[in-house]
Amino acid sequence: MWSDPIADMLTRIRNANVVFKDQVDIPASNLKKEIAEILKREGFIKDYTYIEDGKQGIIRIQMKYKGTRRNRERVIHGIVRISKPGRRIYVDKEHLPKVKNGLGIAILTTSKGVITDKQAREIGVGGEVIAYIW
């Protein structure tokens, strides 16, 4: 059993990225599906699919790389969990983080759902900072 399923998801993605895996399987949850949707929309992963297995389900993430199979370059350069179960990090709308001076994204969970820092600025809401990705 994991004490932090989101950190487990991010670690699986990070490890698959390091060894240039084509896909990675993650135990599913609604929050993880929303995070995968943001990663797809922002161009960090190719796609994801939900696979029903009779239990909680599996999210299969198709990793994305630049270049040919021989000269691959990673699209995800860094992925970090910010708010942890032992120390939650919340920000208000005036203090929304900019990751790598706008080159990366912060994923937040807000009253409006799971969104990026850019969307939170547009809507004008704050929330819990889940992760930084660049």
UniProtKB/Swiss-Prot annotation:
Task: Give UniProt keywords alphabetically.
Answer: Ribonucleoprotein, Ribosomal protein, RNA-binding, rRNA-binding
Which domain of life does this protein belong to?
A: Bacteria
Q: Which InterPro entries match?
A: Ribosomal_uS8, Ribosomal_uS8_CS, Ribosomal_uS8_sf
Q: Which GO terms describe its molecular function?
A: rRNA binding; structural constituent of ribosome
Entry's Gene Ontology BP terms: translation
KW Ribonucleoprotein (keyword) present? yes
List cellular component terms (GO): ribonucleoprotein complex; ribosome
Keyword presence, Cytoplasm: no
User: Hey, which family's this protein in?
Assistant: Belongs to the universal ribosomal protein uS8 family.
Subunit description: Part of the 30S ribosomal subunit. Contacts proteins S5 and S12.
Which HAMAP family is this protein grouped with? Ribosomal_uS8_B
Physiological role: One of the primary rRNA binding proteins, it binds directly to 16S rRNA central domain where it helps coordinate assembly of the platform of the 30S subunit.
Q: What is this protein called?
A: Small ribosomal subunit protein uS8
UniProt source species? Thermosipho melanesiensis (strain DSM 12029 / CIP 104789 / BI429)
